[in-house]
Amino acid sequence: MAEEIYREWFVRMRFPAHEKVKFVKGVPDGWEIKKLGAVLELCHGKALKDRDRVPGEFHVYGSSGVVGTHNKAMVKSRGLIVGRKGNVGSVYWPDRGFFPIDTVYFVKSELPNGFLYFLLRSMNFINNDAAVPGLNRNQAYSNLFILPPAPLIKKYAEVADSQFEIKRFLTRQNEYLTSMRDRDLPRLISGKFAVVYLDIQFPPSMVEPAHET
């Protein structure tokens, strides 16, 4: 839903009260054409080889997504990640601190992550002229986009944040249930997990009717 609202407001230009706004050459009054480099900084990740990782609570991110965990976060809070090598232009939004390795950039910006996430995903970062595929920062910074007014960005970010919070909650619940299954199923199969004393209630459709004798 958050992506569809982004497209509706900032691509199709059907944002709230758009019918009352004057458009000049396709740009709404009060909006600005900006270079990406004017609103954010792409910062290099840091090499972290497998042998140097200490398993922990923080995800390690490469351009293909999560590639492991570590006990320390290079970036202490939520932020955005952009693929630099390999899966060029991939965009991730971790739900906690994280460790970006040297195949990605992490983003610094004053704009809300909820808005930037879909803005970055809409960008074409592929450089077809490069001998080795990769995302050049200067090339990325030169991408043009139309920057909405701050109140509209804030309004959208509130919508996006709430949608992502629901998604993150469901993801954490699924991870918890999966860990419980992986922990308890082998014990159940081997007979080490006693179920005889559990108060298991079956639905009526699963209960066989009692036979009269």
Functional labels for PLM-detected ranges:
Residues 100, 154-155:
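Short small-residue beta-strand/loop micro-motif enriched in glycine and branched aliphatics
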Residues 25-148, 196-213:
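DNA target-recognition domains and sequence-specific DNA-contacting regions of bacterial/archaeal
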Residues 1-8, 12, 16-62, 150-154, ...:
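Non-catalytic DNA-recognition/assembly elements of restriction-modification systems
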Residues 104-106, 156, 166:
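Short histidine-centered catalytic/ligand-binding loop motif
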